[in-house]
Amino acid sequence: LYACVAVSDPLLDILQRYWGYAQFRPGQREAMDAVVQGRDSLLVLPTGGGKSLCFQAPALIRPGVALVISPLISLMKDQVDTLTANGVPAAYLNSAMAPEDRRQVMQGLRERRYRLLYVAPERIAGEGSTILPWLHETCGLSFVAVDEAHCISHWGHDFRPEYRQIGALRQGLPGVSLHAFTATATARVRDDIVAQLGLQDPVTLVGSFDRANLLYRVLPRQTMRAQVRQVLARHRGEAGIIYCPTRREVDTLAASLAEEGYRVRPYHAGLTDEERHANQDAFLNESVDIVVATVAFGMGIDRSDVRFVIHAGAPQSLEHYQQEAGRAGRDGLEAECVLIVSSGDFLRWRDILSKNGDLTEARQGLLRDMERYAASVGCRHRRLVSYFGEAYSKPDCGACDYCLGELESVPDPATLARKILSAVARVGQRYGAAHVGQVLRGQLSEAVRSRGHDTLSVFGLLRDVSVDDLRGYTDQLLAFGLLRQVGDPYPVLQLTDAGAAGLRDAAALDSLSLARQRKPEKGSGPKKSRVEAESWVGVDRDLFDQLRAMRQRLARERGVPPYVIFHDTTLRELARLKPTSMSALRDVYGVGARKADDLGPEVLRVLHGG
C-alpha cells in the first residue's frame, strides 16, 4: 500500500516532521513532485487517499505562499485548524470572517507569515479578481491549487459556474503553476477540468477508486426507521453520518434517535449559522456520535474515524454516492456504507431536477447509473471502480453484501420478470407497484376485486413471494429499463420498449439478473468484512480505549478536535506496538518528531503506567 522513499528526501522529511508519516501513499510522491517542479497537474485521489497533503507539503518547500481555492468554508476552516495545530503557517479568507480577523490575515500576508492561504472561488471572481496579482506582488505566489476541481465541469456532479473563471485569471500570473485536485471524476470530467482550467501539458495522475476498507450494502427500503436502527445497533458509541433527502426527514429522524438515547445532532441549511457550527463542532469534538444531515454536510469534515455512513434514500449520482459514502473510514480502518433505496427516490430526483430546470441529458444519465448500481447483482466494489474506468482484478472483494453472501440470486430471472411484466400489461399499465403486487400475490383487496383483477390469468402467480421481495424485483426491473413509472403524485407502472420485447420473447432477457436479500440464520448477524477482521489483530482493546480517553482529555485541554491530537489509526498502532521509548514512539505511524516531543511523555505514561 505504501511506497518507501530514501530518508534524505526533503518532502519525506516534511511529511515525517509535520504529519508523522514515514512513507508516501500511492500517487502522492508523483503529485508532490509535479507541484515542487512547477508543472501543471491534475490529481484524482479518492477520499481518504491523502489528496490534501499533495499540495500542503510542497507549500513548505516552494518559496512564497500557496493559494488554495476551496468551495466550502467548513472545509477550509478544518484544514487550516489542522495545519496550524501541526505547526504549518496557514490562514483563510472568506465572507463569514469578522473584519478584524480579515485585517489580521491581510497583515500576515504582507509580513509573509503564511505558506498556505485558503480562499473560496467567489473571492477571486468578479471584483475579487485583483487578489491574485496583489498576492503575487506582495508575497509571491508559489502555486495555485484548485480543490474539489470537479466543480468546474459541466459534466461533474457538483457544477459551480464561478469555478470557470479560475483558468482565465492565471493569464496575468506567468510562471505560476496551476494544480487541480478532486476525489471523484470520470474520464469525461477529467478532460473537461483540463480544458476549463487551461492546464498546460499537465501531469495527470489517477489513483485507485477502490476503498477496500469500506463494506458496501444496499437494502431495498422496507421500514426505514427499523432498518436504520439495525445498522446503528452494530455501531454503538461509534461515529457516523446519516444522509436524508430533505430537511424535514433530517429533523424527524434526529429527534427520534435522540429520544432513544443516541448522541445525535441534525445538520442542514434550514438551521442558523450558529446552530450548524455548534452541531458540526459537537461532532468533530466527539461530544456527539451521529450527525443526521442533508448532503451539504461532510465535504470537508476531517473526522477520520467515521465508522458508518447511511444513505436513507438514494443520492442523484454515483459520483455523489462515492464522495458521501467516502466520508467513512478515512483513517483506512474498516467502515460500513449502507444505501437504503426505493424506486421512489429516483422519481423524486427527476421531479426536483425538472422543477429546477436541471433535468439535462447529462443529469438523467447520472441518475440512471445510480439506479442501476442500486439494483445490480454483483460485487459492489467492482461496480463502483469500473464506473470510474478502472479495472477490478479481485475475484471477490470480501466487503460487500454480494461477496459476503447476503444476496440470493433468483434461479430463473427471465420467467420471474415476465410474470411481473405481464401483470403490468394485464392491468392496462394504469396502476402502481403496490396494486400490481397485490394482483401477483393473489390478495383480494377491495381495489383488486372491484376492478375484476382477481379474474386475470396473472392473479396469484407469485403467491409465495413476500411483499418486500416482490417490490425489490419490481424496482430492479425499473432500474434495468424494463419498466418505467409515469405520473405524480401516484405513479403508475408502464412497459418500456425493452420490457415489451422481453414479454414477447424470453430470449431478450437472457442477460438479466435479479436478487433478493438472503434471510440471515437465526441468531447470526451480518458478516464482517475481511478488513475489519484483520485490523484488530494484535491490538490491546483496553489500551486502545485508554488512549482514546487520553486523546479526548488532551483535546479538551487544548481546545482542539480530538483528531488533531491523533487519528484512530495511530491509537491502534500504539496499542498494538506499545513503544517503550521516545525513539520508538517517533516511528509509529501518525506520530512523528513534533508530536512525539509534545505528547510523548503523556502517551508513554498511558502505555506503561508510568
Which role fits each region the language model picked out?
Residues Y2-Y18, A22, P26, E30-L42, ...:
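Helicase motor core with emphasis on the C-terminal RecA-like subdomain
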Residues L67:
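Gly/serine-rich nucleotide phosphate-binding loop at the start of the catalytic core
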Residues Y2-I14, R363-Q364, S393-G610:
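Accessory DNA-binding and partner-docking regions appended to nucleic-acid-acting proteins
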